[in-house]
Amino acid sequence: MELTPREKDKLLLASAGMIAERRKARGLKLNYPEAVALICFEIMEGARDGRTVADLMNYGRTILTADDVMEGVPEMIPDVQVECTFPDGTKLVSIHEPIV
């Protein structure tokens, strides 16, 4: 199977997001890379499901709370940006202060 660098990046992010999702389900507090991966993964999946950019920007702030992550992680993530493929093309989704 031949993948472009962008496809490899998306696959790696999806894998990391699924691992973070499992750890969160087990009650573990997520670290910085896990938190970012989970937020990005959920946003990418939402785009694939047909949600709008505005909807995903709002949804991105509800994925994780400060109780879901290790101490200090919310302050380390002032914003998250992820390129997603929508039916009408690729768009950048920005989530400001994703963990409250």
From Swiss-Prot:
Organism: Aliivibrio fischeri (strain ATCC 700601 / ES114) (Vibrio fischeri)
InterPro entries reported in the protein's UniProt record: Urease_gamma, Urease_gamma/gamma-beta_su, Urease_gamma_sf, Urease_subunit
CC annotations in GO: cytoplasm
Pathway assignment: Nitrogen metabolism; urea degradation; CO(2) and NH(3) from urea (urease route): step 1/1
Database matches in Pfam families: Urease_gamma
Protein name as catalogued: Urease subunit gamma
EC category name: hydrolase
Catalytic activity, reaction form: urea + 2 H2O + H(+) = hydrogencarbonate + 2 NH4(+)
NCBIfam families noted in UniProt: PRK13241.1, urease_gam
Subunit structure: Heterotrimer of UreA (gamma), UreB (beta) and UreC (alpha) subunits. Three heterotrimers associate to form the active enzyme.
GO biological process, one term: urea catabolic process
GO molecular function, one term: urease activity
Protein EC: 3.5.1.5
Family, per entry: Belongs to the urease gamma subunit family.
Cited SUPFAM superfamilies: Urease, gamma-subunit (SSF54111)
Main localization of the protein described in the UniProt heading: cytoplasm
Subcellular localization(s) per the UniProt record: Cytoplasm
Keywords: Cytoplasm, Hydrolase
